[in-house]
Amino acid sequence: SKDVEVIDIGEMSVVPGFIDSHSHLPWSGDRTNELAMRLRGKTYREIAKSGGGIMKTVRDTRSTPKRNLIASGISRVQECIRNGTTTLEAKSGYGLDLDSEVKLLESISEINRSTDIDIRATWLGAHDFPPEMGREDYVEHLISDQLPVISELSLAKWVDVFCEEGWFTNDQTEDIVKAS
């Protein structure tokens, strides 16, 4: 048709933007050594029992100031953009206690305001069990303490639970999801 503009892009391609449906933007620490452990056949559970895994990142993230989490998150988003991502879901989950989970979700909100990408925040308070609280007490804490605050502050529209053997059970997951 005469009304269609044709743009010659030579040997290049036009593709839709990528959507990253699972990311953690604000976090701190380094677990690259765990990749080699996985390649040698270690299970995630074995790595966690040896002091690695989620709790390693939780320890590092809890002690990191929010401004540093935001700066590193923005850097990660810029890399995503360079690689074609236009939308991503960003999970919390490396704080576990209320103050740290709020810090992570506020960081995600600030990263979203500071970058040219569509970021959707997900609360993942049920990522692991913190050492300072028993499992059932923690599930109750998530439902009674964290969820109401996260909801009141409108920090996340979605909820995720790490439902896997050794972590949250099907029943615990169902209780958390129903409460959300």
Where are the language model's segments positioned?
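Short glycine/proline-enriched coil/turn segments at helix->beta-strand junctions
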Residues: 2-3, 155
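Metal-associated gating/positioning segment near the N- to mid-region
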Residues: 3-72
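Metal-coordinating catalytic core of metallo-dependent amide/deamination hydrolases
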Residues: 57-72, 78, 86-180
